Structure formats: C-alpha cells, structure tokens
UniProtKB/Swiss-Prot annotation:
Tyrosine phosphorylated by several non-receptor tyrosine kinases including LCK, FYN and JAK3. Also tyrosine phosphorylated by the non-receptor tyrosine kinase SRMS in an EGF-dependent manner. Phosphorylation by PTK6 negatively regulates its RNA binding ability. Phosphorylation by PTK6 at Tyr-440 dictates the nuclear localization of KHDRBS1. Phosphorylation by MAPK1 at Ser-58, Thr-71 and Thr-84 regulates CD44 alternative splicing by promoting CD44 exon v5 inclusion. Residues 81-94, 283-293, 307-316 have a biased composition (Low complexity). Residues 171-197 form the KH domain. One of its GO terms (biological process) is regulation of apoptotic process. The modification Dimethylated arginine is found at residues 320, 331, 340. The KH domain is required for binding to RNA. This is KH domain-containing, RNA-binding, signal transduction-associated protein 1. The keyword Cell membrane does not apply.
Amino acid sequence: MQRRDDPASRLTRSSGRSCSKDPSGAHPSVRLTPSRPSPLPHRPRGGGGGPRGGARASPATQPPPLLPPSTPGPDATVVGSAPTPLLPPSATAAVKMEPENKYLPELMAEKDSLDPSFTHAMQLLSVEIEKIQKGESKKDDEENYLDLFSHKNMKLKERVLIPVKQYPKFNFVGKILGPQGNTIKRLQEETGAKISVLGKGSMRDKAKEEELRKGGDPKYAHLNMDLHVFIEVFGPPCEAYALMAHAMEEVKKFLVPDMMDDICQEQFLELSYLNGVPEPSRGRGVSVRGRGAAPPPPPVPRGRGVGPPRGALVRGTPVRGSITRGATVTRGVPPPPTVRGAPTPRARTAGIQRIPLPPTPAPETYEDYGYDDTYAEQSYEGYEGYYSQSQGESEYYDYGHGELQDSYEAYGQDDWNGTRPSLKAPPARPVKGAYREHPYGRY
C-alpha cells in the first residue's frame, strides 16, 4: 500500500505517460527514434524522494533530435547561413552597367582636370568617351559572326603602312597620287575601293600640316599617325573581302621604291603630255637617230636607212637605174659585196656618180660572151629579115620542125662553151617573134 501512495513514483508514472501518449508535442520526431533508451528506469535512482527529481525529467530538458540534412526545419531561415537570393535579369544588367556608369564620369572628370597642353591624352580621352556614349564597345563584343547568305552590306577598313622609314628619300606619296591625282583616281576605279593617303607627311604644305595637327580637330587626327594608305570597302561580306584583297594587291605595287618601273614611266609620259611636250614617241626617235652622223640636208623626208626611191640605190645595183645593158663595167664588178653591204651609200641620193669606179680585170669568158651587145645591135634586124622571108611559108607552124631543134641546140652549145668566133646572135633567136601568133609555137 505504501508503494501505491508514494508521491515520487506517482509523479514518475504521470510524466512517462505524458511523453508516450502526447502526439502533438514540441518535437514530433521523437517517434522516429525508438532505439533511444527511455530515461524512466534511471530517474528514480538519481532524483528519488522529492519533486525536484521529477522536474529534471521533464521533456523540455531533452536534447533536440537529429534531422536529415535534406529536410529543412521550421526555422531554417534563422538558424545557419542564409542562401543568396536570386535577382531578376534587370537587376543583373544594372549590376553589370555599374562599372561603365562609374567609368564614364571618371573619364569626364579626368578630362576636365587634365591640362590642355596634353593634346594626345585629351584626344584619347575624347575617343574613349565617345565609344562609351555610343555603346561601340558592346557592339564589338557582340558582332563576332558573319552571315554570308544575307545581302547586308558591311564596311571594311585597313591601313597599309608606307615604308618611309626604310626608304626615306623615295617619294611614295607622289607615286601613289600621280600627276594631278589621276593615278589614284584610276586605282580607285579599277579596285572599287576608296583609297587615300593619310598620316604624317601626307600633305604637301608642312606648315599647314603642323597647324592642323596641333589644332586637335578629330578630322585631322590621322596626322598623328605614321604615313599609311587607308583603304575602305563597302559591300556584302564575300565581295567586300575580295575587293579588299584586290585593292591591297594593287597598292602593294606602288610601294616598291623603283623609279624605272612601268608605273613611273607611264607617269612621266603623262606628265610630259600634260605640260605640252610633243609626243614621247617622236622624242625618242629623234634621240635615237641623233646617235649617228647626220647627213647633209637630204631631199627625202624619211629617216635613216631609207634612201631614194626603190630603183637603183636601195638594192645597191646602180645598173638598173640609168646604165644601159651594154655596160661592161657593172658586169665585171660584182656589186653585192661592195655596195649592198655598206650602210653609207644607202642614205645618199647621188649614187649614180659612184659608177666610174676603178674596174677590176674580169674573166675572159664573160668578155667573149657579150650577149648584151648582140641584143642592142642586131636583134631588130634579124626579126625584120626573118619576117620578110617566112611570112608565106606554113611549115613554121609544125611542132616538130627540124630547123627549130637545130637552132636551139646550136645556141646552147655555142653560147655556154664560148667557141663562137663572132658575137652575133644565133638564127633561132628571132624565131620567138614569129611564134607569138600561135599559142603552141614555143614547143
């Protein structure tokens, strides 16, 4: 009976029932840990005899149960480190724009505080401020792809350096521009690109160039650069790059320091033509002809090597011009080695006076032959006598006449062997005149 009425044991039982039967406690996960030993059997020993021992065994003093890491607790935002909240895209863009928004005021403040004597720094700051205001830095980052199938035109710019440091004495600017700028105009028409010479030394007036350089005008900012050729091309991507390549290849020809190439020679001829000088072909011809000794005033207006008309002197045979066929001097002197080879008589008009040259002894065979004398003396007489005797005879029309054959044979033997005592023509020679009436009389 004493154990039933013991207040300590009664309090212990009541506390054990409340922990096991209360389903809506502060820690509902106590049910998930059944392997945890209950502290009820140990409490009577440590706190027996008074109500304080029962108060220590209250559930408020128990440690909190362990939770799995994936299960958030009701106070997750308070206990532990809080996660970074997600920002909307507009807020992210604003965060990215903050450096640029700060960069622009800094540049403007630095430009205002900078001394105006620093012209280059002022120009660089102005260019950078303009890029940020226009947003060109963003465009350069975004436009990294080319659409080859679109018909959208693009603009290409290239600067080709002129080697003035390697060749300081050569006038590259004059070679590229040409007389009155005609060369660079033709180059632009051929390549389809806009070509200009820019940089230090591109202007003829050095004082004006220095003044414009110090003026700080953005239009003349190129005067602070090295001397170069600026090429601009506008068109579709494929066509633009092709035009740029062609233009650079043509400009490369003008960067060769050679004054005797075809480009410079054409420019010299064009310059002489613009200045009113006669045609270059005539000037060249005069200089070439003046190398030899000029003859005394020739009657023929033609130049060297072209003598009088094509009769007696051009071929070097004066016999054809005015000498009769019976002249033995020309027959005895072989003309080709003495007259035809020499260039001097070809340019002289008075070649007939050179006929009485010292004759050399000719061979006897040529002197005995003398068929020219027979033609001049007895050719017509033989023809007349033959016509008077043979007009009435019809036997001369026979093709196989014996007298005709004998006459031809006698002529050939006596003529070439030189055995004829007289210098008369053979009788068969005049037969040609009679046979002209018949078409077959020659055979």
